[in-house]
Amino acid sequence: MLKGKTYLDHGGTTLYARSLVEKFSEDLVSNLYGNPHSASTPSTLAGDRVDEVRIRTLQFFNADPDHFDLIFASNATAAIKLVAESFRDYHESSESNKRQKGFWYGYHRDAHTSLIGIREFTHGSHFCFRDDEQVNRWFNSGGVIFRLYHARQIGLFAFPGQSNMTGRRLPLTWPAKLRSKKGAKIYTLLDAATLATTCSIDLRDKGAPDFTCVSFYKIFGFPNIGALIVRKEAGHMLQQRKYFGGGTVDIIIALDDTWHAKKDSSLHDELEDGTLPFHSIFALGHALDVHQQLFKSMSRISAHTAYLAKRLFRGISTLTHSNGLSVCRIYKDPEAIYGDPKTQGATIAFNVFDSVGTPIPFTEVEKLANINGIYIRAGGLCNPGGVANFLEFDASEMRAAFAAGHRCSRPLVVMQGRATGVVRVSLGAMSTLSDVNTFLTFLENNY
């Protein structure tokens, strides 16, 4: 499948192993599975398999099933939306919150678009932290700084474990620091979708986030599902959600009354609406097996990809034109160090410039790479805070760009002499030194 091709978009999705597809196919042709909501033998078998994979997946993230639950979702965005809707409904159902229009929400500048979207449920009670220092100042002030939230207001603080744009890894100590604040009613949501691709997510620590979202296709390539991992101590924040779907209620009256009783045996029984994508969940079980067989551990993947990313970073950063000007400008946080998995993931964001310093459209770099059998990603990457920060666009300029016709799917690639997006190269577990060298040769030969 990859002969003569170089895949460098593992941040979008990593590649699935052939053995995973074969094992999954063999499973489906060898067993009869029914809808888990039915009581037949095939359905019972399917339900048991779902339960088994749920526990194994929690263990993959070092999450004790006694203290965590896992709710399957269509992707990480759906998991994030579940938290957002639940906080909105919890706030509306609480008598103590009647005076506040919405729950308070804080999010980091590096947040993916899906995290930023939560702010629309807050009635304006939200705040975007510009950098880590601002987050830490907030912690140290007990939340008073910036007058961020009312003392009685429920809050949610969300951040990505790794920027999907630059690959910079954010501090995972924040949930513990926030939880240590006396009287704090602010919960934490970790977007681990990008981080989990090449880094072990260890939820054994008491400072684990209240909510963690993941995407399995980013880790294993297949299946295309995600999950929300919930600390059971924070689970009550999701239990006031108003919507209920099939399989989440014990009884419901449709005529003459509007009463219903939700399932309360487990958090996932209450929140997984309708029939689960059980075949995809079976595939996840095989993905866990194959991943371990091929790569042994996430720590090995982390070390491998960190080494490759460091080689790639050095290669890109040293490319120059004949007049000495750099070919590429890499967008990197000063505290992030390539080769150090604690601070930097295996992702590089950059733009290419000609010999007089004019940016070459990132779309053209992507197209030329594609023609050469090299698959990367370019654009805004659903990371508006990162784009605004590194490409130095303020809010008024972003609005002006939109008025001029700029769209995420149809970008104006250069505005006022500045690129409006970036080229991103992201490595994965099966990336090789040959992949790195192929891309560097591509840049050398064409720019």
PLM regions and their residue ranges:
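Pyridoxal 5′-phosphate
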Residues: 1-447
